[in-house]
């Protein structure tokens, strides 16, 4: 019997919250969970080298199927020996299916049973993406974890629309499984949809669990719904997911949502947030959000976060970084991106330690208080 490409090992369950501490084993090594995955859209985490990502203990990164299909082309990545060799990253990689980009970037799209017709957001060319094509591209990319091609419904959507969408996503998931040519080397995750409707999340989860994927994702959240709705959906969705397989919440990366997601049984998260906000000088610190472009930092020669031991905070001042961001210097974006990624990866280390010590609930209270999430006008990102 061949070993599955992806295997989840549960190490400990937090007695205070039920959060899970675990390890996901992949063909390119293992990573501890709960884990945050930095996003490398174009086969690079913007402005960061693979060595820097390793310095900050990134165990796995994410790359985008849609973007790499358009440029440079999955054939070129395959010829290079796969994504790991192409980008010089020897740790695990997860690729999304391209579905989210088709639904979010393309103005013109037509959903059919076969797949989605849409226009290339770069040049307007007509393109078609189907479950089979999404599998072919990801098999060429050679990621450790691949995602099934799903329909990404808008928020909000009616129950009737969402029901049709959920059933289509299930039919597409079956086709993905049939088309996946390298199951021993790449693990394919199914994506549970259903919006905010409990009956539809159950319908989606039950159908996908029957297909027996090596892991499952929760899609259709972090698309504009309030935080309390996201938490409620997680509360009724994660119990429907197999306890012996990884659970991945797609597109979530704010510190409060990472902690709240872990408390609700999620193992993996990804988001462009830390690097996207870094580019305009917004930073995550142990005491909350800091916008370094603000005039009050012009003569502030202290570090971004006195409690942070990252390269940025050990070497550069708020005043200097403010100057770099205001003059649009690339080095400034590198420094802010490094800090934000380090901050979230460090936060996940603290979350894992709190689970180990059965005190994630206490950790959440302390963190929210210090960060300012408990205040009436709490600012998020």
Curated annotation (Swiss-Prot):
Binds 1 zinc ion per subunit. Pfam families: TGT (PF01702). GO terms for cellular component: cytosol. Keywords: Glycosyltransferase, Metal-binding, Queuosine biosynthesis, Transferase, tRNA processing, Zinc. Residues 251-257, 275-279 are annotated as: RNA binding. It is an enzyme of class 2 (transferase). This is Queuine tRNA-ribosyltransferase. Its EC number is 2.4.2.29. Homodimer. Within each dimer, one monomer is responsible for RNA recognition and catalysis, while the other monomer binds to the replacement base PreQ1. PANTHER family: QUEUINE TRNA-RIBOSYLTRANSFERASE (PTHR46499:SF1). InterPro entries: ArchSynthase1/Queuine_TRR, TGT, TGT-like_sf, tRNA_ribo_trans-like. Belongs to the queuine tRNA-ribosyltransferase family. One of its GO terms (molecular function) is tRNA-guanosine(34) queuine transglycosylase activity. The active site is at residues 96, 270. Zn(2+) binds at residues 308, 310, 313, 339. Gene3D superfamilies: Queuine tRNA-ribosyltransferase-like (3.20.20.105). It catalyses: 7-aminomethyl-7-carbaguanine + guanosine(34) in tRNA = 7-aminomethyl-7-carbaguanosine(34) in tRNA + guanine. Its cofactor is Zn(2+). It comes from the Bacteria. Substrate binds at residues 96-100, 150, 193, 220. The lineage of its organism: Bacteria, Bacillati, Bacillota, Bacilli, Bacillales. Catalyzes the base-exchange of a guanine (G) residue with the queuine precursor 7-aminomethyl-7-deazaguanine (PreQ1) at position 34 (anticodon wobble position) in tRNAs with GU(N) anticodons (tRNA-Asp, -Asn, -His and -Tyr). Catalysis occurs through a double-displacement mechanism. The nucleophile active site attacks the C1' of nucleotide 34 to detach the guanine base from the RNA, forming a covalent enzyme-RNA intermediate. The proton acceptor active site deprotonates the incoming PreQ1, allowing a nucleophilic attack on the C1' of the ribose to form the product. The keyword Heme does not apply. GO terms for biological process: queuosine biosynthetic process; tRNA wobble guanine modification; tRNA-guanine transglycosylation. Pathway: tRNA modification; tRNA-queuosine biosynthesis.
